[in-house]
UniProtKB/Swiss-Prot annotation:
Pfam families: FlgI. The gene is flgI. Assembles around the rod to form the L-ring and probably protects the motor/basal body from shearing forces during rotation. The keyword Signal applies. Residues 1-21 form the signal peptide. GO terms for cellular component: bacterial-type flagellum basal body, distal rod, P ring; outer membrane-bounded periplasmic space. It comes from Colwellia psychrerythraea (strain 34H / ATCC BAA-681) (Vibrio psychroerythus). Keywords: Bacterial flagellum, Periplasm, Signal. The lineage of its organism: Bacteria, Pseudomonadati, Pseudomonadota, Gammaproteobacteria, Alteromonadales. Its main location: periplasm. GO terms for biological process: bacterial-type flagellum-dependent cell motility. Belongs to the FlgI family. This is Flagellar P-ring protein. The keyword RNA-binding does not apply. It comes from the Bacteria.
C-alpha cells in the first residue's frame, strides 16, 4: 500500500523542533544497510630493489608465472627483490553495483622495505562467504619513506610498507541487502539508550501514528511500504526527521596508555577529601536554608554551597566558587603541576569512595 504524507503537516512538525534537535540519520543506522569487508592476497611488482626474498613470495611468483604458461624448474630460486607479497583489503559499501569502483589498501606481508613505486597486479577480493566480489589492480600511492645504510641503521618517515589505490577495485558482484524484504524497517541507535529509543519512536509516531515501536535500548521498528520505490521515499522522509536525544550517561573515559581523560558534562562530585603524594584536595558541601518572613507567602529554599581547595607541598592553595564539577577538579590538579598519572590515580580513588556521580571507564 502506497504511503501518502501530508507535506504541510511535515514541515510544520519540523519547524516546531528544538534548535538542539538532531536528524535520525545522524543518530541511527538502518538495519541491513551496512558495508562489507573484502580481503585478498596479491603481489606488488616494479619495486626499486625494496622487495623481499621470502619463501612464500617466491612460491607466489612461480604460481603467477605458471598461470601465464611459464614453467620454472623446482630447484631454481629466482632473485626477485622488486616483488613483494601483500594483503589487499577494502570495504564494499551497501548498494554498490557491479562496475563501480572502490578504494583498496595494500599492506606488505613480508620483509619488504618499501612499496613506493610498485604496482599491484590483478588480485581477487573475497568476502567472508568465500565469494569473489571485486578485482583490484593499479599503481600504489605510498606516503611513507624509508632509507637504510650499510651498517643497518635506517630512517623511517610514516609507514612505507602500506599503500593505497584510489578507485583501484572494480566491483564484480553486488551484496544482497535485506532492506527491500519484509513489511518493517529497523533503526539501530549508534549509542544505545532507552530514553533516546523511546524519543525516536515517539517522533515517528507523531508523524505517522502507530507506525513505530521501540524494541529495546538500540532498535526501533517501523512499519514500512512493501513496494521498494515507496520504501525509499518513505525512508528519505523518516531519516530527516529531527528530535532532541536524551542526555548521555555521566561517564569519565580514561586512556591509561596516553593519559587522555574525557569527562562528560553530566559528571559531578560529592563531598570528599583526598591527599595524593604532595597534593591535597578537599571538597566541602554546605547546605544553606533561605527562610522567608512569616507573612511573606514565600517558600523555604535549600541551596547547596560547594567549596574545593587544592594544595601541594609548596603550600599553594586554590579556592573555587560553589558549583564543583569534576572538570574543575582536574583543572585544579593540573595547575599544581600534577601529571596525567596523578589525575588518574585521584579519579580512581574518588570512584572507589563513591564520590563520583558517574561511571569511570578505563581503557
Amino acid at each position: 500500500m502506497k504511503t501518502v504524507i501530508n507535506i504541510f503537516i511535515l514541515f510544520t512538525f519540523l519547524a516546531s523542533l528544538s534548535a538542539n534537535a538532531q536528524r535520525i540519520k545522524d543518530l541511527a543506522d538502518v538495519a541491513g544497510v551496512r558495508s562489507n569487508q573484502l580481503i585478498g592476497y596479491g603481489l606488488v611488482v616494479g619495486l626499486p630493489g625494496t622487495g623481499e626474498q621470502s619463501p612464500f613470495t617466491e612460491q607466489s611468483f612461480k604460481t603467477m608465472l605458471s598461470n601465464f604458461g611459464i614453467t620454472m624448474p623446482d630447484k631454481l630460486k629466482p632473485k626477485i627483490k622488486n616483488v613483494a607479497a601483500v594483503a589487499v583489503h577494502a570495504e564494499l559499501s551497501a548498494f554498490t553495483k557491479p562496475g563501480q569502483t572502490i578504494d583498496v589498501t595494500v599492506s606488505s606481508m613480508g620483509s619488504a622495505q618499501s612499496l613506493r613505486g610498485g604496482t599491484l597486479i590483478q588480485t581477487i577480493l573475497m568476502g567472508i562467504d568465500g565469494n569473489a566480489y571485486a578485482v583490484a589492480q593499479g599503481s600504489l600511492i605510498v606516503s611513507g619513506l624509508g632509507a637504510q645504510g650499510l651498517d643497518g641503521s635506517q630512517v623511517l618517515v610514516n609507514i612505507p610498507t602500506v599503500g593505497r589505490i584510489a578507485n583501484g577495485g572494480i566491483v564484480e558482484r553486488e551484496v544482497k541487502s535485506p532492506f527491500s524484504s519484509g513489511d518493517h524497517i529497523t533503526f539501530n541507535l549508534r549509542h544505545s539508550d532507552f530514553t533516546t529509543a523511546k524519543l525516536l519512536s515517539d517522533t515517528i509516531n507523531d508523524l505517522i501514528e502507530g507506525s513505530a515501536k521501540a524494541l529495546d535500548a538500540t532498535s526501533v521498528r517501523v512499519r514500512a511500504p512493501r513496494d521498494i520505490s515507496d520504501r525509499v521515499s518513505f525512508l528519505s522522509v523518516l531519516e530527516n526527521l529531527e528530535f532532541e536525544p536524551a542526555s548521555p550517561a555521566a561517564k569519565i573515559i580514561v586512556n591509561s596508555r596516553t593519559g587522555t581523560i574525557v569527562i562528560g558534562s553530566e559528571v559531578t562530585l560529592l563531598a570528599a577529601a583526598i591527599t595524593h603524594g604532595g597534593i591535597t584536595v578537599t571538597i566541602n558541601e554546605i547546605q544553606d536554608v533561605s527562610q522567608p518572613n512569616a507573612f511573606a507567602e514565600g517558600e523555604t529554599v535549600v541551596t547547596n554551597q560547594s567549596d574545593i581547595n587544592v594544595s601541594n607541598s609548596d603550600a599553594r592553595m586554590f579556592v573555587f566558587k560553589p558549583g564543583v564539577t569534576l572538570e574543575t577538579l582536574v583543572r585544579a590538579i593540573n595547575e599544581v603541576g600534577a601529571g596525567p598519572g596523578d589525575v588518574m590515580a585521584i579519579l580512581e580513588a574518588l570512584d572507589q569512595a563513591g564520590a563520583i556521580r558517574g561511571e569511570l571507564v578505563i581503557i
